[in-house]
């Protein structure tokens, strides 16, 4: 276990002032007779430390910058103390052991005795007061003059703990520099073999026996904190983590090993902004959504397409939240870029199975994005410039240590690239996008926090001055968080999100038109967290969503146009839910979680509704009545119970098995004629004639942490089966743009999907990254006794996004602290397609005969990316820090097929392949920020 120089001063930890009598001699204080076997022979020192810490359950502390390089030589089993002395004394090092299996190596005097009563000033009571001297306690040891002493934290008081054997211990984990809360930090209690993970506010809590406990606090990219907690009564404390500067730009996926092995969660991935710094991306733009595509079970139909498919489900079964605000279009330029500026994102959590009960309304996945909070200490700024985008971020305190703001802006200047094209249509086109994020945080005392978040994004695309697309996302969320005590809390959120789309087409003057639609999502949610019941974590609450869908206006664009005006009006629906869940630790090895969510969806007027003959196709000739409903009159109600059940059994601390079952209801879906999400897609509510979608998912997984070759690895394998009833498919040849009665253009049926996902991740060393492989199959079945209500003759067919095989390899190699190289290798099976297979003549007319639905596939997809990152100097005192990233997207220049289309030419059918990126895309990006690399 090594630390960079800004945290290593603890090597003076047993001061010359207090312990001068021990100077200039090797010390083995309270040494343990740990046996080291011949298996350690010929290991480098770094590999020896990794292996020893993992297998011998010890922690070795030393100063890496000045440490010599050598190989361990051991011919027979020997004591650890003797082995270290033989190899290190000749370099002038002294070694000490303490009672907690910590090994200290230093050229300075060492003692491991803690002065009694030294920590009296660090007692923490129930009032959530901060520990004194934050600058001092941000490391593993507290400094007094030149002395460092292993730290103990006392929680509560003896008086408050009288007649009690247990106590509730809670606290907050924060960044040592910015003082921002750290979400997803792990608090592990080694003596009890369990732990906790901090929530969005950096808060944690658990019940402990009174007495002393060894606690380890860790987080991606931060230095690990090891402390001894002396629990006297109920109490709380704050702990500050510093950045682990030695792991420069290390790419990390998932929160930490405790989430994977110890929690009941399945199908969950956490992505931090550190994960995307070195991932090579098109045009040099950081993109957290593109990084998500490198995870197992996540696919897209092709480059330049919006949305993606999770475990075989369509794109409309995913829901994105950023700070509780739903976003209904997550892309810029029709899918080339994400609509989320990665500079303002703190972390991104993906739930693809065992979705928390507080979320509902989507069958496949929930993407929960957390925006950064502003710096409460000082004002700062950062930004970057790439070939087609520029971005800037501002943050700072509104009131120091109490409230803060952060504002991120991003825009494009891509038209110059289009002007370079030889094709006149492209040369006359234009494309622009931008987005803005503002996040304001206010702490109202120790128990209340208010967060105000706003988001705006826009896109404008003019295609050869003939067709113009405009679409916008705009919304705000207000979240109030209240702590009742150290362990129980309440969250209240109020949000509104609006998605606007408009299209203008003047390709043909007499048929020129303008078309627009809009979706409004207004939501209120109240959620309670109860953690003061032993071995239980309870969450319950309610939420309600008002959907208002402006289905579309269709109007002539000019006086020459012969298009008739048409307004489809507005539809409304209210989706409400009550939910409760409990995570129950039955034993140190077995934990279960269960939840219920009751949904009620009400479809409201004003609306005219067709009534069709029972059990007959929904076509105009089968209409027997039309019902007229007034404004806010109930047209139709649907209800259902969602289930969440999961269990985790730990065979040991590094190996577990998990099982889970989910049921979900979905009351809103997407209407689109294209395979990929195009800007002109429309959202539609379940109504009188269209039932809600209901889905079940079953999953099982094995999770491992292992140590091999001096490095740690995380391994997981998950299998799943999911089915959905009442999925919506579009009839062949249906016109969706201004269809007043969508049930006449759609059919409902069944979806089945199953698959296996394998993930291997290397966490340590100069070379790190991950590899994953996914095998999956997805099929749809639309059957009926009536031919017009069948697709593919009622026979199951592969879904449009079915890709059985997919693998991703992501690697990063750090040559030096300032230089790193990373690369991706991406492969997937081509998606299904329906081919014309023959020409036949009917009544003298040529007719094409097509294959079965999605019987064939386009060519397989393969791509290699590469990037080189160079950091500026790592001086501590500097005005600003800069870095350069050179990246190549599609290094091999492979012409991956986005689609295959056919033309009838000279009496035969010719097939053509359309590629989005048929050559390498090279980019150079400059990033800057005020301050040094660490802050």
Where are these regions (language model features)?
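Signature of Gram-negative outer-membrane beta-barrel scaffolds
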Residues: 541-654, 785
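Gram-negative outer-membrane beta-barrel transporters
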Residues: 720-723, 742-837, 927
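Membrane-embedded beta-barrel scaffold of Gram-negative outer-membrane proteins
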Residues: 495, 650, 658-662, 668, ...
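Short, acidic Ser/Thr/Gly-rich low-complexity loop/linker segments typical of extracellular
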Residues: 192-203, 636, 640
């Amino acid at each position: 276990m090594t630390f960079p120089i800004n945290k290593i001063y603890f090597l003076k930890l047993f001061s010359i002032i207090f312990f001068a009598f021990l100077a200039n001699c090797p010390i083995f204080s309270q040494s343990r007779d740990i046996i080291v076997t011949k298996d350690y022979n010929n290991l480098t020192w770094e590999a020896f430390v990794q292996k020893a810490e993992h297998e011998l359950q010890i922690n070795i502390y030393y100063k890496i910058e000045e440490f010599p390089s050598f190989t361990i030589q051991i011919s027979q089993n020997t004591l650890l103390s003797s082995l270290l002395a033989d190899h290190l004394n000749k370099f002038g090092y002294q070694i000490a052991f303490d009672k907690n299996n910590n090994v200290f190596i230093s050229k300075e005097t060492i003692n491991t005795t803690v002065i009694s009563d030294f920590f009296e000033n660090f007692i923490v009571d129930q009032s959530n007061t901060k520990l004194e001297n934050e600058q001092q306690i941000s490391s593993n040891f507290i400094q007094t003059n030149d002395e460092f002493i292993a730290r103990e934290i006392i929680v509560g008081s003896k008086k408050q703990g009288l007649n009690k054997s247990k106590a509730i211990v809670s606290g907050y984990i924060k960044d040592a520099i910015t003082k921002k809360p750290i979400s997803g930090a792990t608090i592990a209690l080694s003596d009890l073999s369990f732990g906790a993970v901090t929530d969005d506010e950096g808060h944690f809590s658990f019940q402990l026996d009174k007495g002393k406990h060894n606690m380890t606090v860790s987080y991606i990219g931060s230095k690990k904190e090891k402390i001894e907690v002396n629990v006297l009564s109920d109490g709380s404390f704050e702990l500050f983590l510093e950045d682990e500067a030695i792991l420069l730009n290390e790419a990390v996926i998932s929160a930490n090993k405790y989430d994977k092995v110890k929690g009941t969660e399945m199908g969950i991935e956490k992505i931090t902004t550190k994960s995307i710094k070195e991932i090579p991306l098109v045009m040099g733009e950081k993109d957290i959504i593109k990084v998500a595509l490198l995870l197992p079970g996540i696919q897209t139909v092709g480059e330049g397409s919006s949305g993606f498919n999770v475990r075989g489900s369509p794109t409309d079964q995913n829901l994105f939240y950023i700070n509780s605000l739903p976003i209904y279009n997550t892309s810029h330029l029709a899918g080339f870029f994400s609509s989320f500026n990665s500079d303002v994102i703190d972390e991104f959590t993906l739930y693809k199975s065992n979705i928390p009960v507080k979320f509902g309304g989507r069958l496949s996945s929930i993407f929960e994005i957390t925006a950064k909070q502003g710096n409460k200490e000082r004002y700062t700024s950062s930004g970057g410039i790439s070939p087609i985008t520029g971005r800037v971020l501002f943050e700072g305190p509104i009131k120091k240590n109490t409230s803060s703001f952060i504002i991120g802006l991003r825009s494009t200047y891509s038209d110059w690239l289009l002007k370079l094209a030889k094709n006149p249509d492209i040369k006359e086109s234009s494309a622009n996008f931008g987005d803005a994020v503002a996040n304001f945080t206010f702490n109202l005392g120790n128990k209340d926090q208010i967060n105000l978040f706003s988001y705006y994004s826009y896109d404008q695309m003019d295609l050869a001055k003939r067709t113009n697309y405009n679409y916008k996302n705009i919304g705000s969320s207000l979240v109030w968080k209240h702590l009742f005590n150290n362990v129980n809390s309440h969250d209240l959120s109020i949000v509104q999100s609006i998605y606007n789309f408009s299209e203008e087409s003047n390709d043909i003057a007499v048929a020129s038109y303008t078309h627009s639609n809009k979706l409004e999502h207004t939501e209120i949610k109240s959620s309670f967290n109860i953690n003061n019941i032993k071995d239980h974590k309870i969450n319950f609450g309610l939420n309600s969503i008002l959907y208002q869908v402006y289905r579309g206006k269709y109007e002539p664009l000019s006086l020459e146009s012969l298009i008739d005006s048409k307004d489809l009006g507005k539809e409304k629906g209210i989706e409400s839910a009550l939910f409760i869940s409990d995570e129950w630790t039955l034993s140190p090895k077995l934990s279960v979680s269960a939840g219920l969510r009751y949904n009620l969806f009400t479809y409201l007027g004003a609306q005219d509704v067709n009534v069709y003959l029972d059990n007959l196709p929904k076509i105009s000739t089968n209409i027997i009545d039309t019902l007229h409903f007034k404004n806010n009159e109930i047209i139709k109600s649907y209800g259902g119970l969602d289930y969440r059940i999961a269990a985790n059994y730990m065979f040991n601390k590094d190996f577990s098995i998990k099982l889970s079952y989910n049921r979900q209801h979905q009351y809103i879906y997407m209407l689109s004629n294209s395979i990929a999400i195009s800007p002109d897609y429309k959202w539609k509510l379940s109504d009188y004639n269209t039932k809600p979608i209901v889905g079940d998912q079953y999953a099982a997984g094995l999770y491992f942490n292992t140590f091999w070759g001096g490095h740690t690895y995380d391994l997981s394998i998950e299998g799943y089966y999911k089915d959905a009833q009442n999925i919506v498919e579009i009839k062949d040849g249906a016109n969706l743009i201004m269809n007043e009665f969508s049930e006449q253009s759609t059919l409902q049926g069944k979806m089945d999907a199953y698959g296996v996902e394998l993930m291997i991740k290397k966490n340590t060393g100069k070379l790190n990254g991950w590899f994953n492989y996914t095998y999956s199959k997805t099929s749809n079945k639309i059957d009926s006794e009536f031919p017009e209500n069948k697709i593919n003759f009622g026979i199951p067919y592969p879904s449009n996004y079915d890709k059985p095989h997919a693998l991703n390899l992501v690697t990063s190699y750090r040559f030096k602290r300032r230089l790193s190289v990373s690369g991706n290798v991406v492969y997937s099976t081509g998606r299904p397609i329906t081919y014309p297979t023959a020409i036949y003549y009917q009544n003298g007319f040529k007719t094409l005969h097509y294959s079965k639905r999605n019987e064939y596939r386009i060519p397989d997809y393969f791509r290699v990316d590469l990037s080189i990152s160079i950091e500026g100097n790592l001086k501590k005192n500097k005005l600003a820090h800069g870095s350069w990233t050179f990246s190549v997207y599609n290094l091999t220049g492979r012409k991956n097929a986005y689609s295959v289309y056919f033309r009838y030419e000279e009496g035969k059918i010719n097939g053509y392949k359309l590629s989005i990126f048929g050559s390498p895309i090279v980019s150079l990006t400059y990033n800057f920020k005020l301050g040094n690399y660490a802050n």
